[in-house]
């Protein structure tokens, strides 16, 4: 369980200190960081974290001029707090030396979950979905037209009148409402 990554180690130490602080101050009200009575758990944890003592790794310089340094590399984000300008320059020199010695640049890894791929997939799906109801509707229309064509001309007119009367009868229901 021992991790050699300094960022992971720093995070674990900070979580341990925060846990100890919360346990120590859970029975008594805090005077260092007053918290309102109606504050939710997240706000209380944020207030406790603000009042927690700062834990430093051995070998870290305490410099008031240090700023946060963020590195984006290989799909990961690394954030270094209190980075001095000298340390940032050294990191940039190291990165440029590592980049220059490689020869031909490597192709970035293919990302499976790209928004463009999802957009194209959705477009294909919707195209298939649109085609399905249209073909289903057209097949019903063709069948109905074929059934009408099979009837003799005299029966077609009679069937049309019957269909009209059926719709009128369904809509009015006159005999039920005449009371």
Curated annotation (Swiss-Prot):
Pfam families linked to this entry: Jas_motif, tify
Signal peptide span: none
Q: Reproduce the UniProt comment on modification after translation.
A: Ubiquitinated. Targeted for degradation by the SCF(COI1) E3 ubiquitin ligase-proteasome pathway during jasmonate signaling.
* Motif Jas in this chain: 115-140
Record flagged with keyword Lipoprotein: no
Disulfide-linked positions: none
Q: Which comment does the entry carry about domains?
A: The jas domain (115-140) is required for interaction with COI1.
Function, as annotated, reads:
Repressor of jasmonate (JA) responses. Forms a ternary complex with RSS3 and BHLH94 to negatively regulate JA-responsive genes. Acts as a positive regulator of tolerance to salt stress. Involved in salt tolerance by modulating potassium homeostasis through JA signaling and regulation of the expression of potassium ion transporter genes. Acts as a transcriptional regulator targeted by the SCF(COI1) E3 ubiquitin ligase complexes in the JA signaling pathway, and interacts with BHLH062 that may directly regulate the ion transporter genes.
UniProt main location, coarse: nucleus
Record localization: Nucleus
The molecule here is called: Protein TIFY 11a
Nuclear localization signal (motif): residue ranges: 117-124
Q: Which GO terms describe its biological process?
A: regulation of defense response; regulation of jasmonic acid mediated signaling pathway; response to wounding
Domain of life assignment: Eukaryota
The Tify domain, residue ranges: 62-97
The similarity annotation says: Belongs to the TIFY/JAZ family.
Q: How does it assemble?
A: Interacts with BHLH148. Interacts with COI1A in a coronatine-dependent manner. Interacts with COI1B in a coronatine-dependent manner. Coronatine is an analog of jasmonoyl isoleucine (JA-Ile). Interacts with RSS3. Forms a ternary complex with RSS3 and BHLH094 in the nucleus. Interacts with BHLH062 and NINJA1. Interacts with MYB30.
Organism lineage = Eukaryota, Viridiplantae, Streptophyta, Embryophyta, Tracheophyta
The induction field says:
By jasmonate, wounding, and cold, drought and salt stresses. Down-regulated by abscisic acid (ABA).
Q: What else is known?
A: Plants over-expressing TIFY11A/JAZ9 display increased tolerance to salt and dehydration stresses. Plants silencing TIFY11A/JAZ9 exhibit decreased tolerance to salt stress. Plants over-expressing TIFY11A/JAZ9 display decreased tolerance to cold stress.
Q: Which UniProt keywords apply?
A: Jasmonic acid signaling pathway, Nucleus, Stress response, Transcription, Transcription regulation, Ubl conjugation
GO cellular component term, pick one: nucleus
